[in-house]
Amino acid sequence: NKWRQAIAALSVFQQRFPKHNLYDDASDKLVFAYIENSEPISAAEKLVEISNTVADKEKTSNSLYKAAEIYQENDFHNLAMPLLASFIDRYPNKFDLAIEAHNAHISYYEEQKNASSKMKWQEKLVSYEKSNSKKRTARSSSLAANAAFELTYSDLEKFESIHLSLPLKGSLAKKKKALKNIVSKLEGLSIYQDSVIMSAATYQIASVYRTLARDILVSERPGSLSELQLEQYDILLEEQAYPFEEQAMDIYMINIEKVAQGHYDKWIEQTFEVMAKMNPTEFKRDLKVTPYAETMF
């Protein structure tokens, strides 16, 4: 066919005249011919060559990114990722494309079930987006907000893994410190002004306070107590736990109140479900109303 003939002719020309001033023009034509002839991988290879040899920075950056896109579209993600990483290093000022390149790595490692590499790229995305905050877009903000929120999962795991053992004062102080750390990170997500992420952060903050209250109530008891002393100890634990449970409910209410402002998402729905357990007399009734909220807003 004509595209096969064009590819052959252009390839011969480049082999014979590698220094010719039309060499780069022939490369562009080859990319087009490969795509028209359904040879996307050959097109990608030629684009990589262009990205490494042409002086025009705009052309090299576009060629490199386009090559990565072609590899991705044809499920050669293992070849696309190094190109996207190179793009980020070589063209940090290409903000929109660099954001997408970061996100492509996150998606790739999520698919590969490689949690540590995914987390590494989430950290890179958050850091890169933050350092270029003047260029922030709705898209970059949304991606960074989601990455930053997911990065708090490891802090949540650390918090939940702290067992309240005797002496209670020491282990409780450790758990409270972990709580402050995660709450600080979740509150920091407000910079993204993302309604869903703020619902998620509010839900998680309330949940860690609720978890702390529960963990205090089921914490280890001293073995040497009499029945009366044990009852008194239980009362002391309830007094310790109560403020945290109250704080959790107050924070959950922030999500509940968002419904009246026209907001409803899965985190608000989960908030209603939790409140129905914590305060059933008031929220069992409200829970029946919430399925209609999505149609209202």
Question: Where are these predicted regions, by residue range?
Answer:
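Acidic, polar-rich low-complexity tracts and alpha-helical solenoid repeat scaffolds
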Residues: 1-297
